[in-house]
Amino acid sequence: MCGIFGYCNFLIEKTRGEIIDTLIEGLQALEYKEYDSSGISIQGDELKSLNIYKQTGKISSLKEEIDLYNLNKNLPFISHCGIAHTRRATHGGLRRANCHPHNSDPSNEFVVVHNGVITNFANLKALLVAKGYVFKSDTDTECIPKLYKHIYDTSIELGYNLDFHVLTNLVLKELEGSYGLLCTSSHFPDEVVAARKGSPLVIGVKGKTDMDVNFVEVEYLDQEEDYLKLNTQTKSSGNVLAAAPVKYNTCLRKSPPLRSQYLRNSTTSTFNHGSSTETPAENGLPRPMEFYLSSDCASLARYVSKVVYLEDNDIAHIYDGELHIHCSKIGSEDFSFRTELSKIKKGPYDNFMQKEIYEQCETTKNVMRGRVDAFTNRVVLGGLENWLTELRRAKRIIMIASKASFHSCLAARPIFEELMEVPVNVELALDFVDRNCCIFRNDVCIFVSRSGETTDTINALNYCIKKEAVTIGVVNCSGSSISRFTHCGVHTNTGPEKGIATTKSYTSQYIALVMIALWMSEDLVSKIERRKEIIQALTIVPSQIKEVLELEPLIIELCDKKLKQHDTFLLLGRGYQFASALEGASKMKEISYVHSESILTNELGHRVLAVASDNPPIIAFATKDAFSPKIASCIDQIIERKGNPIIICNKGHKIWEQDKQKGNVVTLEVPQTVDCLQGILNVIPLQLISYWLAIKKDIGVDLPRDSAMSAPDI
């Protein structure tokens, strides 16, 4: 699984070259998700024909593959639907046959791109093989288009002419597991269906004017009412299986069509609404429209400003300039979002990772803007206010996350324990679900995710919701699954993070969690002075980050002369800084391709050095806090054993001055702040070391090998 993108134009003439370019640009916007192959499907030269182009490797290889066919890129299409995909091999190895899109047969009657895992694909494959279908790949996805064809052919034999979304529903009923998929078909030209269950999909709408967007058909149909009828009437008969009169359809409406006294009146919608027949387009003709579909809303930022998020079990059907959403439940919502294009371009930087490291001065301001008041020493979190009573009477706090988000939770755990005086657990999302942890109604569960779509974290969230715990989301993407399914939350306002390495999201999550701890403990009189100290320190963190970034020339020299020849690193930390060591070690593995291990300082003597060869570089966090004397003692032992540690310490810390002059140690001096925030400053030198080690080794830092933004649910 990896990235999905689709593009549909209706009554807007586009050349084949323009359509291909749009699909390729969409895939390039998803490149920050690690992938190893890509492909697209577009209409062929003949009516009702679909062509597939796919290739292993980077998107540039796909472009070269397409060029080999000498396509007529000037061929115009007044209406067209194309789909595209980047794949990271899960089911089936890395070979061209396993790349998406997948087809139903050599004629490409049905073509599918898919994210997720179909858990019953072996049974489906056996059934379809028995029916005479030939499989060319090792993937679970290939069973989907073949199942489409099998059900379609069977329905035709029985005399049924099913609509595309009805056919899709019959297919989905046979699938077990998770999916986000797009399907096109030669039997339904210029149409596309999208469906999701456990894997995100978002649809962007674009017209020639805002009015066109406000009045595009978005028809919400009740799945049970719709599909159980299995109405065989086609669109040509004028009936689109509507569960309500067409006059109630609205664009991007927050409430479904008015069908009963229990539903909100459509006039409460904050968007313009009305019947498309009551607000005809110019000259009474259908409105020209464009639709963009993606697994990640950030990839739509350059095209649209309004998007619709599909919920689990929803089916979206796009045709004739209309978007019909067949809902599993009432109340599918729409969102407006704004993402400045400058935030998804590299600008003057060589790559996105470098850009995002330097953006931390600004992103740490953004997460605090309007929330931290240094004059009143208060933290205001409007996203949590409605749950104030439940949150402050929590008997236990559980933070659940994966990867770098897990490290940010570990970094914030001590301050939660200190300020809240309740037990605080930090859990890896996958392990949390596997153990069926005990969760109670008076627990507060905090879910932290960079994308808001991390599969394991979403599974943990669903588990906690069933246990009736209060849930908080800390995410960067508004409208993501975690932000919508949690009771309340804090948006980190970090902006798009295109690099695989989590840099600015880590520091923003760290600050967001500290702010939650400050907000939840506001009623504890005994913590007033401690809270004031932290709030005052928060306000100067952005300027202190700027000071830390001034270490870059020293770090470049250090990587060039002392570090790049090593392939093993040890990182030492204790207290708040153990999380910094974990995050730093993770970055070095992920970006620099070196073995790095994070160790509690007092564990160093327990045979760790015995298994490390060639006197590996040791990076120690020794900034001032309650553990400083013990860490200094540990560093002294390393020096005595002929080690040459790299020490991250505070400015003006003179304890290693003599050793520094002798060349025994290298110090990276960072500004001093309160202990619970020091990790924000300390992790940045490790980000820079990871970055420059990779650059010195000619590694592509934005797309390191074998990394993925979200893992499949296996």
UniProtKB/Swiss-Prot annotation:
Look up the domain of life of the source: Eukaryota
Q: Which InterPro entries match?
A: GATase_2_dom, GFAT_N, GlmS/AgaS_SIS, GlmS/FrlB_SIS, Ntn_hydrolases_N, SIS_dom, SIS_dom_sf
Q: Which residues form a coiled coil?
A: none
Quote the catalytic activity from the record.
D-fructose 6-phosphate + L-glutamine = D-glucosamine 6-phosphate + L-glutamate
Give the EC class as a word.
transferase
Known SUPFAM superfamilies for this protein?
N-terminal nucleophile aminohydrolases (Ntn hydrolases), SIS domain
Annotated Polar residues bias: 266-280
Q: In which pathway does it act?
A: Nucleotide-sugar biosynthesis; UDP-N-acetyl-alpha-D-glucosamine biosynthesis; alpha-D-glucosamine 6-phosphate from D-fructose 6-phosphate: step 1/1
SIS domain location: 387-526, 559-704
Gene3D superfamilies recorded: Glucose-6-phosphate isomerase like protein, domain 1, Glutamine Phosphoribosylpyrophosphate, subunit 1, domain 1
Q: Which UniProt keywords apply?
A: Aminotransferase, Glutamine amidotransferase, Repeat, Transferase
Q: What is the name listed in the Swiss-Prot or TrEMBL entry for this protein?
A: Putative glutamine--fructose-6-phosphate aminotransferase [isomerizing]
